[in-house]
A protein has these predicted regions:
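A surface/extracellular/periplasmic glyco- and lipid-processing/surface-interacting theme
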Residues: 29-89, 96-298
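Bacterial N-terminal signal peptides that target proteins for export
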Residues: 1-9
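Bacterial signal peptide processing site
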Residues: 23-26
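Core hydrophobic alpha-helical transmembrane segments of single-pass membrane proteins
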Residues: 12-15
């Protein structure tokens, strides 16, 4: 089964996709399909494919719905995260100061548990969310991000406007207030209805991912990769994904420590995608915010 995806890069972005999972999962991931003998068995129809993971497990009520994207704090004080192992796709990229921020994507907002801690958006992530036709959930943002929201017409929900009603603070960890913001899928769904935000996916939208059929046999042809090291520019944000042959998943550690959610489950994924791109400091920005070149790379 295809599990959640994380995206990171030594230079800028890390994408972990096809599902972020925690714990043991069945291993049916693959890269190249094998030819099979003709069969008289009727072809199975998959009517509930999750467009972010390729799995045939999307609730009927979520079919044709827009994904929801959450801006997530990745400061060490914000770990362990609430809801990490529930995300379909995790995208991580550089922000100012050499630190990273994450954007988690969900195909079904009703499945979003307590999630956080939430942080402010950056313009690069606004563009990525727009590319997924997603509703962007965040707590504040940079001037460039708010400009991008306006320019691109991105639907967004800002915790600064709804603190105490749909967005909340959890002070039980005794950390700085910027590491305490959270919400839930139920709150976001209610707020979207209140604000009359379109929930149906744009008819012109196509998933950026191409998946095989859930039961399609696959075999790897480009060798074995038992470990993936992802280095950002600053200590505290570097990952190691270690392959486990028993379940076919890559288990994520950050700075040598298993990356776990608030329930104590380690993040494990099927696909790790690294994107290398140019990153530059925005001229005249007093906070040293950066711009990731999303128009190219490899």
């Amino acid at each position: 089964m295809l599990r959640n995806t994380i995206l990171c890069s030594a230079a800028a972005l890390l994408l972990v996709a096809s599902l972020t999972a925690c714990g043991n999962q069945d291993n049916t991931s693959s890269v190249v399909s094998e030819e099979s003998a003709p069969s008289s068995v009727a072809e199975v129809k998959y009517e509930n494919i999750n467009p972010l993971t390729g799995e045939n497990n999307l609730a009927t009520s979520a079919k044709g719905q827009r994904p929801i994207a959450f801006m997530i704090n990745n400061n060490p004080s914000a770990r362990p995260h609430w809801g990490l192992c529930s995300a379909d796709v995790v995208i991580e990229g550089l922000v100012e100061g050499g630190s990273t921020r994450m954007m988690w994507l969900f195909s079904d907002v009703s499945n979003v548990p307590k999630i956080g801690s939430l942080r402010s958006m950056r313009h690069d992530f606004v563009e990525i969310a727009d590319g997924f036709d997603a509703v962007l959930v965040h707590w504040g943002g940079s001037p460039q991000a708010y400009t991008s929201v306006s320019t691109n017409g991105v639907d967004e929900l800002d915790g600064l406007s709804y603190e105490g009603s749909y967005f909340f603070r959890d002070s039980t960890r005794n950390v700085a207030i910027e590491h305490t913001g959270y919400t839930t899928g139920e709150n976001i769904l209610t707020l979207m209805e209140q604000k009359e935000i379109e929930t149906k996916a744009n008819s012109q939208y196509a998933s950026p991912f191409t998946f095989g059929k859930p039961d399609e046999k696959r075999t790897l042809t480009d060798g074995t990769c038992k470990q993936v090291d992802v280095f950002f520019s600053t200590a505290g944000y570097n990952h190691t994904f270690t392959y486990d042959e028993s379940d076919g998943l890559y288990y994520n550690s950050i700075e040598g420590t298993p990356m776990k959610d608030d329930n104590g489950q380690q993040m494990a994924v099927t696909n790790v995608i690294g994107l290398y791109m140019n990153v530059s400091t925005i001229a005249g920005d007093g906070s040293g915010r950066v711009d990731m070149d999303l128009s190219g790379g490899e």
